[in-house]
Swiss-Prot record:
The gene is dapB. Catalyzes the conversion of 4-hydroxy-tetrahydrodipicolinate (HTPA) to tetrahydrodipicolinate. The lineage of its organism: Bacteria, Pseudomonadati, Thermomicrobiota, Thermomicrobia, Thermomicrobiales. InterPro entries: DapB_C, DapB_N, DapB_N_CS, DHDPR_bac, NAD(P)-bd_dom_sf. Gene3D superfamilies: Dihydrodipicolinate Reductase, domain 2, NAD(P)-binding Rossmann-like Domain. This is 4-hydroxy-tetrahydrodipicolinate reductase. (S)-2,3,4,5-tetrahydrodipicolinate binds at H150, G159, T160. One of its GO terms (molecular function) is NAD binding. Its main location: cytoplasm. It is found in: Cytoplasm. It catalyses: (S)-2,3,4,5-tetrahydrodipicolinate + NAD(+) + H2O = (2S,4S)-4-hydroxy-2,3,4,5-tetrahydrodipicolinate + NADH + H(+); (S)-2,3,4,5-tetrahydrodipicolinate + NADP(+) + H2O = (2S,4S)-4-hydroxy-2,3,4,5-tetrahydrodipicolinate + NADPH + H(+).
Amino acid sequence: MLRLALTGVTGRMGRAVLELAASAPDIQLVCGLIRPARDPHEVAAQLPAPLALTSRVAELVQGADVVVDFSHPAVTVAVAEAAAHAGIPLVSGTTGLSEHDQAVILRAAQHVPVVQAANFSLGIALLHWLLPELVARLPTWDVELIERHHRHKRDAPSGTALALARTLLAAREPAPSPLVYGRGPGTAPRQPGEVGIHAVRAGGEVGRHTVLLATDDEAIEVTHWVQSRRAYAQGALEAARRLIGRPPGLYSLQDLVT
């Protein structure tokens, strides 16, 4: 039985993971993290499944086999340090991390296995495998990336879009131009090798990422469309299962599933 601790239990992703984990026969929910100002009884009454709650990170990791984190950068940093100190693997999907925050994650990965992904969809993991193949075979084609999310999403471009862009850039030979964010008034003509990235925020879109490869004569569009946050939750729980027993290090989701 996999004993799982969870952050961000009142957020969209935390609730999705909680609901799915509660119905999984191989997972035991041991603890959830809430903000100190919140009343644990009030929060517990609003959750989709029973869960012991704490506002103390040190208590969160006690008795857990793995921590799944979908929270805020400041929380992620504290959880990463606590997990490393306790020797507990960490699955983190928090985005918007600073360079300092990422350095803390890297230090934690020296002591415990850490899987970090901006998107825990298994389809996105496979897209990271597919895109380099396309770009390598079509080296002169223009590449643009368009991502769409709900109106409430704060970071733009999304962490997933940035990760996909890095995958595309790494597959480009020779060395590509930098990323181009949007194409507003006064934008210079497209340069060979560059990758354009565009963010759309509207409605209730859970997440859609489209990679466009084009010449003057033809084009290919590859689109991944998430219809439910359960897709992310399923990927995060699968990552937690596969992380157990791995040596310390920083893993991507595609490291675990491809």
